[in-house]
Amino acid sequence: MTKEKWFKLVNKEYSQIDQEWQWTYLLLIPFIFNEQVIHKITITDHWKEKHKDIITNEKILELVRKLNKEVMKPEPKKKPAWPDVFVPRGIEYQNKRFLLVFWFERSSSDWLWIRDCYPN
């Protein structure tokens, strides 16, 4: 039995503004987070600064899959202008727990921006 493909890489670019690599994926199956249908996910390379030996984009995508149909509250804002940031803790993958840091990109309700991932 083959695993259903959830994501398709549609863009890989280096952002001069953010000084980081960014990979954008389209969702190939219905994916819902906070009662919103998600169509795109962008992963930044911020995780490579400290966790390149244990984190990969593929692992992040597997963790994101586990958020399908989840509803969660954002973290308290540190600055009013910042987006609502979500930090689910303890997402299990291969008998280990991980933490993701992400938000809805550009106030979009269908695009998640994954900023970081690390062991929890």
What is each residue range found by the language model?
Residues M1-N120:
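Ribonuclease/tRNase effector modules and their secretory precursors
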